[in-house]
Amino acid sequence: GAKMSKLQRCRKWPISLVSTLLSFLFLMSMVPVASAYSYSKSHWLNKNQVVMLMATVKGNYLTSAQQAVSNINSATKVGFSTGTRMVWQATSQNFGKNGWEGQSAYTFLASGYTKDAVSRVNTYYMKSSYPVARMRVLWLHEFSHCWGLGHSTINTVMYKSASDAYNNGVRYLTSDDIKGINSRY
């Protein structure tokens, strides 16, 4: 075969590299974007739920909880409202220095679906003087656990610490949080 000079080999190499990179980028554009959401054990049989905001939820806690309910209701396929049914309760009170700013708990029917739930904000850590937006992210986080979401990445409501998500710029449900809830219902 014909011998190529060193100069000819050097000129050919960048063309190979560019075509390989372009092929790689094209193939990567075909890969669907992965979702970061995960699931908790909670899964309601009915996608329409009512949360009862207990008397302890007042002032900025009430405003932020109502905003969280509205955000979930408008951004997802579920129907979420406030009312006086005792199936899902939300409370904000001083649970003391226990390490959590918010917590959700639920019990299950024999079928495995969620029977009832409670979402709690610990005012020991989440002070009434904090911004409503910060409280809203915490309510969104706890309500989303009850809708069936587990923890996710820091740029979502479902990051393991709602305050860290807030400090990272999260204010409302993100597209990942929305996809997670919608895929569940």
Kindly label every feature range from the protein language model.
Residues 32-185:
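Zinc-dependent metalloendopeptidases
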Residues 1-3:
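Short, Lys/Arg-enriched N-terminal segments with co-localized hydrophobic residues
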Residues 7-36:
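Sec-dependent N-terminal signal peptides of Gram-positive bacterial secreted proteins and lipoproteins
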Residues 5-16, 40, 46, 60:
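Serine/threonine-rich low-complexity intrinsically disordered regions
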